[in-house]
Amino acid sequence: MVPKVLVMSGYGINCETETAHAFQKAGAETDIVHINDLIAGKKKMADYEIIMFPGGFSYGDDTGSGNAFANKIKNNLFDDLKEFINSGKLILGICNGFQVMTNLGLFALPSTDYGERISALEANTNNRYECRWVHVKENDSICVFTKGITITHVPIAHGEGRFYCDEKTYFELKENKQIVFSYCDSEGNSANQEYPLNPNGAYYDIAGICDKTGRIMGLMPHPERSLYSISEPEYQLKKEIAKRNREIIPEFIESNLQIFKNAVEYFNK
């Protein structure tokens, strides 16, 4: 089947188009929907297979990144969202979307239920907005979005991306293989919570996590902004090296596109 993706929009979300494009390149159908149309009943979550919370600055990050948008969902759509989760479908959140999902409590542990917040995404330790490329490695997690991915090169753009949770939660995440991505160097060596490899001071270098089923993932980096090789900062150098070696640079950064392909393939097992 061709899954349909509900790409959330409204109130400062600004990555809808490139996120929809990523899913389309992976073979999905997409529908960019304003949150008010869901609240008004013009569109229904149940009509989709994947819900996507894109990046941006919802409500200008007032009251904390992702908090106001999460409250709007809690107050109007949370029952629909829980039904969507219980039906076995997928949810993905990138950057501000990860922040929204964190505030909603969507990253349930084996010991918790949906709606219970287990972690936070706090201000970067250097108190600066970080906008550049980083490397992250996949931690052999249970996440359905990341099968076949090891290390990938991907951009970040955030001021509040420092993952934090208490020790008990961290060890439960680790034991259940819910820590999906960690910041690293180009060879996959741990960032050891050191800048600049870890851009925000994230606890144990955590860049992305999933829920206890592996069907709900959030991450701070932006794979939807880095589908194409031409977008990499080193593209011109790589192009020249490839030319001299009579090689061709692949059109896509496959490890980033794979996230969206895995979501589509999940519904075609």
Curated annotation (Swiss-Prot):
| Protein origin, superkingdom | Archaea
- Identify the main location: cytoplasm
State a single Pfam family of this protein: GATase_5
Q: Which residues form the Glutamine amidotransferase type-1 domain?
A: 5-262
EC number(s) given by UniProt: 6.3.5.3, 3.5.1.2
Q: Where in the cell is it found?
A: Cytoplasm
Q: Name one GO biological process term.
A: 'de novo' IMP biosynthetic process
Q: Which UniProt keywords apply?
A: ATP-binding, Cytoplasm, Glutamine amidotransferase, Hydrolase, Ligase, Nucleotide-binding, Purine biosynthesis
Pathway info: Purine metabolism; IMP biosynthesis via de novo pathway; 5-amino-1-(5-phospho-D-ribosyl)imidazole from N(2)-formyl-N(1)-(5-phospho-D-ribosyl)glycinamide: step 1/2
* Reaction equation(s) it catalyzes: N(2)-formyl-N(1)-(5-phospho-beta-D-ribosyl)glycinamide + L-glutamine + ATP + H2O = 2-formamido-N(1)-(5-O-phospho-beta-D-ribosyl)acetamidine + L-glutamate + ADP + phosphate + H(+); L-glutamine + H2O = L-glutamate + NH4(+)
Record-level GO cellular component terms:
cytoplasm
Role description: Part of the phosphoribosylformylglycinamidine synthase complex involved in the purines biosynthetic pathway. Catalyzes the ATP-dependent conversion of formylglycinamide ribonucleotide (FGAR) and glutamine to yield formylglycinamidine ribonucleotide (FGAM) and glutamate. The FGAM synthase complex is composed of three subunits. PurQ produces an ammonia molecule by converting glutamine to glutamate. PurL transfers the ammonia molecule to FGAR to form FGAM in an ATP-dependent manner.
Q: What HAMAP family does the database record attribute to this sequence?
A: PurQ
Designated name of the protein: Phosphoribosylformylglycinamidine synthase subunit PurQ
Q: Which organism's genome codes for this protein? A: Methanococcus maripaludis (strain C5 / ATCC BAA-1333)
Q: Which gene encodes it?
A: purQ
